[in-house]
Amino acid sequence: MYNLNALIDRLIEISINNNLIEDMDTVYTRNRLLSLFNENSYTPCEEKLTLSFHETLNELINIAIEKKIIEDALYSKDIFSSDIMNIFLPTPSLINKEFYKRYAISPKESTDYFYSLSKSSNYIRTDRIAKNINFKAPSKYGTMDITINLSKPEKDPKEIALARNSVKSNYPKCLLCIENEGYEGTVTHPDRANHRMIRLDLNDRTWMLQYSPYLYYNEHCIILSEDHVPMKIDISTFKNLLSFVDKFPHYFAGSNADLPIVGGSILSHEHYQGGNHRFPMNDAKKLFNFSIDGFEDVECEAIKWPISTIRLRGENIDSLVLASDLILKKWRDYSDETLDILAYSNSEMHNTITPMVRKEDGKFVVDLSLRNNRTSKEHPLGIFHPHEEVHHIKKENIGLIEVMGLAVLPGRLLKELEKIKEYLRDEISLDNIEEYHRPWALELKKKFDYLKSSTDLNDFVNKELSNKFVSVLEHCGVFKLNEEGLEGFKRFTNSLNS
């Protein structure tokens, strides 16, 4: 085991290099770290370590376990590591002052500062994110982004038992609330001692900007309401998203829908997602143009994308807000029984929108994906939701990130796809494949046996996985990209002028 003093010196050295602290802070920081380890003396160490940031942090955690300061459990190790890094961080007010000082130079400089801080303080878990499998694969709609999510570690049985028997608390109310800033964490609630948020004014309300601890794409940020209020899609959503992109034109911003099945995983707290990433949907081609009376300054088109999406372009924020709101209101009450689209069942609302906003070539671009959460006997989880035949790949809600063409697939697929590759190489029998994958594996075998002389196996499986994800998205499209669906899509866009 490494010497504690040497590890502390190494972490301080790394943090100075990462601009978390300055040389002047060395003695103070060292003493605060010693206190965490119940030590009240320090002897300089001749040994100079060259460990990486995460290696150093992990060795410090090992010492804390050895000294019985913490349990050897994931939640307590995470809490302790956040306590360590919190020592290196300024208070929220100081971080906000620095952010806006840099914002006066440029919006990008301010987000670069905050993103770097969030990584250097270990709030963004870059070590765990690095475990994800990411690749791009072609499809009939363009190149898709595929991620097999391996970043979130699984809890061990002991930790699950502790969580089951723990006292329930309503503080913080949810994972997004402002009360998470600096929160110690428990066995049931993640550590947030090293968590900081930037205060934003959007549409005369206070919002918070933070980065996701488990990034799915570059600079994946969350914009959350100061108040714990439910998700909603209305005219204020469009105002907020456009206001955010106006303030940070190098970022996109979007919202999950506000209804179950087609919404995100957290419907209880109003929030948006954003970041500095170009998604496959951004490059989707035009399907057809249309116009909306009274909005001559707004370009309108339907795009060729598996989830039925209207794209608006314009320079005037007010016009885009009003045009988006008109489309939302029309869609809320729109039914087309020939395509299984019903706006209401009794008093239950089914229609909503997944919106995204970005700035491109001096114009704002607003993408409005039309969603419907109705269920049926044939499709009890949702008519416009991944159907049973694709559940072996993805059965969870299709939210904003997936709508834009980035698949976030379960970690179990890593081993399961390797088995499928072994089957395609005739190394194992079909019985060794998980039962829910067998129909797909048989289908792949027929294709691969025909193509294998000219096709790389990994590329083949990646492309087929991408195609399966495209099927997931196609199931969610309310207007299918066939003759009947296109006619239906045009009936809806025509209704915008009635």
Swiss-Prot record:
Uppermost EC category:
transferase
Pfam families for the chain: GalP_UDP_tr_C, GalP_UDP_transf
- PROSITE patterns on file: GAL_P_UDP_TRANSF_II
The highest taxon in the source lineage is Bacteria
| UniProt entry tagged with the keyword Electron transport | no
Choose one Gene Ontology CC annotation of this protein and give it: cytoplasm
Instruction: Name a GO molecular-function annotation.
Output: UDP-glucose:hexose-1-phosphate uridylyltransferase activity
Q: Which GO terms describe its biological process?
A: galactose metabolic process
The UniProt keyword set, sorted, is:
Carbohydrate metabolism, Cytoplasm, Galactose metabolism, Nucleotidyltransferase, Transferase
Q: In which pathway does it act?
A: Carbohydrate metabolism; galactose metabolism
* Catalytically driven reaction(s): alpha-D-galactose 1-phosphate + UDP-alpha-D-glucose = alpha-D-glucose 1-phosphate + UDP-alpha-D-galactose
Record EC number? 2.7.7.12
What does the UniProt entry say about where the protein is found?
Cytoplasm
Q: Which family does it belong to?
A: Belongs to the galactose-1-phosphate uridylyltransferase type 2 family.
The record ties this protein, via NCBIfam families, to: galT_2, PRK05270.1-2
Which named protein is this? Galactose-1-phosphate uridylyltransferase
The species is: Clostridium perfringens (strain ATCC 13124 / DSM 756 / JCM 1290 / NCIMB 6125 / NCTC 8237 / Type A)
